[in-house]
Amino acid sequence: MKGIQCKLARVALGWGVIELASRAKVSTQTITRLERGDQLRPSTLESIQSVLEEAGIEFIKENGGGIGVRFRDPD
């Protein structure tokens, strides 16, 4: 997950930085650092990504059209 994907997912869910940080059990500074492109520990990234995926976000890998996020199909 890239920082821009985190921000897009967070905004799509209507969450602020505080909400995501609380759910992922990380500091707001950690979310801010990720969203501006800083490197985080893999375990921290996994924690944040897991929370977003559990909320229904699917991460789109770079496939020629660029990276992104979308809501997972509930089926």
How would you label these PLM feature ranges?
Residues 25-40:
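Recognition helix of helix-turn-helix/homeodomain-like DNA-binding domains
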Residues 6-19:
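Short basic helix-loop element that most often maps to the first helix and adjoining turn
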Residues 25, 42-60:
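DNA major-groove recognition helix of helix-turn-helix/homeodomain DNA-binding modules
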Residues 20-21, 69:
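Append "Primarily bacterial transcriptional regulators
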Residues 57-75:
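Helix-turn-helix/homeodomain-like alpha-helical modules used for DNA recognition
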Residues 2, 13, 41:
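Short, conserved glycine- and acidic-residue-centered signature motifs
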Residues 19, 30, 44:
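Residues in the helix-turn-helix
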